[in-house]
């Protein structure tokens, strides 16, 4: 089976794309292969069996994906998230469509031969502070309005909670993922006690001393600290935005309920329409 076209994104796009510690860590083929093996109960040993797939211009189009790669006849889209996003099935549909377009480029879709495609698998690794079950599923059909019967188009995304203490069996089979969860837990714990910069530095120092992601942190310490600070700031701002949106929605709902009550009472009391409008 032919492999998907792989291209390297332009340098400007890389600068604009905000990296994460998760993506930095698993961009290494050996580590990514260990995660894939743990996820699928496989025993691949040669990292070259895994091919990283990068879509040219995907970042510019707002369709970035943390880790897109192929193993055998599968194409896997892995993404790390620290906030819940129910729109991931739609995002993944857009992204995988670009992958398939790249694969069948210059091939006729009107011939009598079936064009074979890599089997897709979509996974989100969640480690936010909101409560989430160890394994949940998002479906594209959840977004359909007035769906009747089975959907003609479906896309399922598995969401795994990889916070420390969750999905222990998976962690046992992927030491790198387990240590990543330990690092994140330390950052969060110390952030509650001290300034963010100091919390990240302490977490990194402690992990190195305890042999947690030791080589990775020694080799990438400055970048990991910077990215961790940016990640936490981003999470904090998104949390504040969600809280503000919730409060605005609650206030709007209260105002709507009050107005609805005025109209209903006025109509019941046969109050003239101009007088009802004046009360609103």
Q: Which residues does each PLM region occupy?
A:
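Elongated, amphipathic alpha-helical interaction scaffolds
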Residues: 1-280
């Amino acid at each position: 089976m032919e492999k998907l076209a792989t291209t390297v994104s332009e340098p400007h796009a890389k600068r604009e794309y905000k990296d994460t510690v998760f993506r930095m860590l698993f961009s290494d083929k050996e580590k990514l292969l260990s995660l894939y093996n743990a996820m699928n109960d496989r025993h691949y040993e040669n990292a070259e069996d895994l091919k990283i797939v990068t879509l040219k211009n995907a970042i510019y189009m707002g369709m970035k994906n943390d880790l897109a790669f192929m193993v055998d006849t599968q194409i896997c889209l892995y993404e790390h998230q620290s906030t819940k996003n129910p729109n991931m099935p739609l995002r993944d549909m857009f992204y995988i469509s670009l992958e398939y377009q790249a694969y069948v480029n210059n091939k006729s879709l009107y011939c009598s031969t079936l064009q074979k495609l890599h089997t897709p698998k979509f996974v989100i690794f969640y480690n936010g502070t909101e409560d989430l079950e160890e394994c949940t599923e998002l479906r594209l059909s959840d977004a359909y309005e007035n769906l009747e019967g089975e959907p003609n188009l479906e896309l399922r995304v598995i969401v795994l909670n990889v916070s420390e203490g969750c999905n222990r069996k998976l962690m046992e089979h992927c030491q790198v993922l387990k240590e990543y969860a330990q690092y994140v837990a330390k950052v969060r714990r110390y952030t509650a006690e001290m300034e963010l910069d100091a919390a990240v530095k302490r977490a990194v120092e402690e992990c190195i001393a305890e042999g947690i992601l030791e080589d990775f942190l020694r080799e990438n310490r400055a970048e990991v600290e910077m990215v961790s600070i940016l990640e936490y700031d981003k999470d904090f701002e998104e949390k504040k935005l969600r809280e503000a949106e919730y409060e605005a929605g609650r206030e709007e709902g209260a105002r709507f309920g009050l107005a609805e009550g005025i109209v209903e009472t006025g109509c019941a009391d046969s109050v003239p329409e101009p007088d009802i409008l004046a009360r609103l």
